[in-house]
Amino acid sequence: MVKVGVNGFGRIGRLVTRAAFNSGKVDIVAINDPFIDLNYMVYMFQYDSTHGKFHGTVKAENGKLVINGKSISIFQERDPANIKWGDAGAEYVVESTGVFTTMEKAGAHLKGGAKRVIISAPSADAPMFVMGVNHEKYDNSLKIVSNASCTTNCLAPLAKVIHDNFGIVEGLMTTVHAITATQKTVDGPSGKLWRDGRGAAQNIIPASTGAAKAVGKVIPELNGKLTGMAFRVPTPNVSVVDLTCRLEKAAKYDDIKKVVKQASEGPLKGILGYTEDQVVSCDFNSDTHSSTFDAGAGIALNDHFVKLISWYDNEFGYSNRVVDLMVYMASKE
């Protein structure tokens, strides 16, 4: 089992740790966060407003974080190059601060003895992998990889199934996206993106997202064929993708439902879900899929032009894929 260090104990860092303990697929051996001391880590890991209390034991003991009886080394370094991952036995590092997202910056972890780095965010220059879509293109010459974004992880599996079966001529995506930590509780300054600084709980906020264009990086045949935007809405978690696309081959909406259902039960099982239930966003809280196709919500204008809807827990689904990507990488060592 691969030994993992986590840099940044925020939403994704904590939930990757939860996903690791829930699944038992990887071994968390170290956590670094300069802003959260050990006792605070215990509290933050145990209690979660969105996903509920951790089902297990968590305590501080002898300067370590102990989860379900397993001791985890704690570091509080600001500079990633100073974290002694090797001493803690961490082979892979999950870079989840949101700050060190380039090859150069994330590469600092290798100086402390880590063998590989998984960036839990899109990266300008690191190769991006989406489980179920292009993870098989990974090869172990790569030291630093990106798990792309939560939205790309939702959109790409659906786009792959549609493109493989009917061909996507072009498409536009909108994600109706839950609040994240980068937003403001009340109106405040926000650099160049003025709208992003408006109160998150009070507004529907149009925002940019690179998620659709990023699909072109993980599915090269779709490069230049998709783009998209986001609406940030006042919900704490769970988002939904609306993919509106023109199809090469004519398809009835029932044909689309059929191929997505088949994929969800076959090659994309556990990654792409399928439901015909009358669901709403809360129904996907703590769901581990990257994407769940909502068969009842989509519409077709004609046999070549459709709007497809897919839900995702933007925190927990994504965190589970980070774990799955590490498991896959470890299988190639």
Curated annotation (Swiss-Prot):
First-listed, main subcellular location of the protein, grouped into a coarse class: cytoplasm
Active site residues according to the UniProt entry: 150
Deamidated asparagine modification, residue list: 7, 62, 68, 147, 153, 223, 314
Modified residues (S-nitrosocysteine): 150, 245
Function: Has both glyceraldehyde-3-phosphate dehydrogenase and nitrosylase activities, thereby playing a role in glycolysis and nuclear functions, respectively. Glyceraldehyde-3-phosphate dehydrogenase is a key enzyme in glycolysis that catalyzes the first step of the pathway by converting D-glyceraldehyde 3-phosphate (G3P) into 3-phospho-D-glyceroyl phosphate. Modulates the organization and assembly of the cytoskeleton. Facilitates the CHP1-dependent microtubule and membrane associations through its ability to stimulate the binding of CHP1 to microtubules.
Pfam families membership: Gp_dh_C, Gp_dh_N
Binding site for NAD(+): 11-12, 33, 78, 120, 314
Record PTM N6-malonyllysine, positions in chain: 192, 213
Domain notes: The [IL]-x-C-x-x-[DE] motif is a proposed target motif for cysteine S-nitrosylation mediated by the iNOS-S100A8/A9 transnitrosylase complex.
Residues reported to bind D-glyceraldehyde 3-phosphate: 149-151, 180, 209-210, 232
Phosphotyrosine PTM positions: 40
Residue ranges of the region described as Interaction with WARS1: 1-146
Residues found modified as S-(2-succinyl)cysteine: 150, 245
Signal peptide (residue range): none
Molecular function as annotated in GO: glyceraldehyde-3-phosphate dehydrogenase (NAD+) (phosphorylating) activity; microtubule binding; NAD binding; NADP binding; peptidyl-cysteine S-nitrosylase activity
SUBUNIT field: Homotetramer. Interacts with TPPP; the interaction is direct. Interacts (when S-nitrosylated) with SIAH1; leading to nuclear translocation. Interacts with RILPL1/GOSPEL, leading to prevent the interaction between GAPDH and SIAH1 and prevent nuclear translocation. Interacts with CHP1; the interaction increases the binding of CHP1 with microtubules. Associates with microtubules. Interacts with EIF1AD, USP25, PRKCI and WARS1. Interacts with phosphorylated RPL13A; inhibited by oxidatively-modified low-densitity lipoprotein (LDL(ox)). Component of the GAIT complex.
PROSITE patterns according to UniProt: GAPDH
Provenance organism: Mustela putorius furo (European domestic ferret)
Modified residues (Phosphoserine): 120, 146, 149, 239, 310, 331
Listed name of the protein: Glyceraldehyde-3-phosphate dehydrogenase
GO cellular component, one term: GAIT complex
Swiss-Prot/TrEMBL site (Activates thiol group during catalysis) positions: 177
